[in-house]
């Protein structure tokens, strides 16, 4: 029974490793990556951080010790493979970038016009449903977590106030000025990207 309780607590700690409220300075070191690990492990310098940013699905965006040229060939895509398979030209790379949820952002051999209609959105459908005009497309781009980035029929000014943030709230709460907006953009994982009153 004691061992059962111990392992239950251990599992909870692994699932919720950073529930304690951190200060702003600590938060910078504790921003979780999308799928485990931290974007800047606490205590690491800026130079080390560049080498330790985990990719979304394993590995690191810049494996430690690699040059900028090598890094370009080693950035893992979100769902397997690499955004630029080593040795491929820029032209080939454009055709080989996997989309987030299957297929390719530009299926090999498709024209730019066709590509615009075939980029899958992150959560189903397409960013520009085939056959829609650019104006209609602007109203139909699904947001990452429900709704639409520009609800159909809203003006550009209204759209700015209605873009949902990735995890609740809005990137620019309606009625706030550009200066206030900078202080109110929610971060992806709680808090705000620029806490109110802080300098740039």
From Swiss-Prot:
Keyword Signal (UniProt): yes
Alanine amide: modified positions: 42, 108, 152, 196
GO MF annotation list: opioid peptide activity; toxin activity
Region forming the signal peptide: 1-23
GO cellular component labels: extracellular region
Region feature Disordered, mapped onto this chain: 30-200
Tissue distribution of the protein: Venom gland.
Localization annotation: Secreted
Coarse class of the protein's main subcellular location: secreted
Positions of the pro-segment in this chain: 24-34, 45-100, 111-144, 155-188, 199-200
UniProt keyword terms in alphabetical order: Amidation, G-protein coupled receptor impairing toxin, Secreted, Signal, Toxin
UniProt key word Amino-acid biosynthesis: no
Function: Synthetic BmK-YA activates human opioid receptors in vitro, with highest activity on the delta-type/OPRD1 receptor (EC(50)=2.5 uM) and lower activity on mu-type/OPRM1 and kappa-type/OPRK1 receptors (EC(50)=17 uM and 30 uM, respectively).
Record protein name field: BmK-YA precursor
Organism: Olivierus martensii
